[in-house]
Amino acid sequence: FFPEDALKLTELAKKNNVTAIVDCGVAPGMSNLILGYHNEKMKIDSFECMVGGLPKKRTQPFEYKAPFSPIDVLEEYTRPARYVENSCIVTKTALSDAEFIDFNKVGTLESFNTDGLRSILFTMGHIPNMKEKTLRYPGHIDLMKSLIKAGFLNTEAIQYKGQSISPLGFTSALLFDQWKLGATEAEFT
C-alpha cells in the first residue's frame, strides 16, 4: 500500500517511459480483473468484494496470518474505508459495519469495511454501488479495536526509556513472527 493516488502518477510514468502496475494483488488486483471482465460482458449495478487470506489452522489469540507485511494489515485497520453507495463515494471507519457470514466447509467469518477498492473507485466510477469487506475469523475485529483503543496502532512516536518509538512499528514488529505464514502452513483466500 502507498497513500498516493496511483492514477495521479500516470503522467509521471508516461514521461519516464515506465509501465506501473498498481493494485495488483488478490484484492485489489484479482478482484479488479474479475470486475473488469464482467463489466465488459454486462451492466453492473452493484459490486461487493469479500476477501481475506486466512490460515486453515486457527491459532489463538489472533487466528490470523499475514501473507504480506503486518504493518500494511494494521494500517488497513486504521485507514478510513471508502466505498460507493448510490453513485457517491462514502467514507466510513475501518472495521465498521461488521457482519457474520457463513461459508460451506469454512464456517462463520466476520466481515468489515476496509479501504480496498482504491483505483476502481475511479476506473469503475459508473457502477453505482461498490464495496470491499475483509473477512476474518470471529473475534478479530474486537482484538483489533482493543489494540487501536489502547494506542498500539498510533503512528505518532512516543518516548520510552529515552528512545523514540512508533507504537504501530513496535506492534508490527511484535506481530511479524506471530503473523508470518510458514512455508508449510496452509491458508485459503
Please identify what each model-predicted range represents:
Residues F1-A20:
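Rossmann-fold NAD(P)-binding glycine/threonine-rich loop
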Residues F2-L7, A27-M30, G53-R58:
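Short gly/pro/ser/thr-enriched loop/turn and capping motifs at secondary-structure boundaries
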Residues L9-T10, L35, N39, L121:
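Short amphipathic alpha-helical segments and helix-helix/interface helices
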Residues N17, N39-M42:
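Generic helix-packing signal
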Residues A20-D23, C49:
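General beta-strand structural signal in soluble alpha/beta enzymes
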Residues C24-I34, N39:
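Short alpha-helices
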Residues K41-T189:
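C-terminal catalytic/substrate-binding lobe primarily of soluble NAD(P)-dependent oxidoreductases
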